[in-house]
Amino acid sequence: MGGRGASSGAGRYRGGGGISASDILSTRDLISEREHNQQFVDEILTPFWDANNEYGYVAEQIQLATLKPNSNAIAYYDGSNIALNETFYNKKGLETAYAACVKSGFHPSNGKKTAAEAVMAHEIGHALTDAVGKKLGTPFIDQSATIIVNEARKQTKHKGVVQMARKISTYATSSNAEAIAEAFSDVYCNGGRAKSESKAIMNVINGYLK
């Protein structure tokens, strides 16, 4: 189960936010919060709606999750659903933290999209990797991710996948799966201005799913 981590003391995101099922205390459908916080909920849901329109199916639900206090995951994809840690269900805090990460190069720019849209797009990238895996018959997301990034690298001038991932973001170098998630977030947020390496990864994804 993968997810983004956060260092709340530093006010920014960092990698290593993977969680286990035992970290999840409860979840609820995010749409249930729309009556009370429509604008922010819609920001979070927009990438999900967009991806569903483009690919047909991405995830069953977008959820808010209550996690154990020692969990630093901001959001995660569990193989069926995408969830946002309710601790980070705060627009201002999310925007401030994400801006710091973009400035440092840890995550790609979110362009004209909001931080919430960028974070959820990242998790959708994991879901799309999973969808490709089902097409390939590969049972593990890391195995699917390796196939995807190796195909994408051939569309670039890079000699290795880490070198390619480094052009996307620092976090993209942590694993092939994170490189894909960062690439989708980059392309979703920046369109034609996204990094060429991100576009190469999405070309491969789209080749399998469209």
Regions found by a protein language model. Give the residues of each.
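Long, low-complexity, intrinsically disordered regions
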Residues: M1-R4, S8-A10
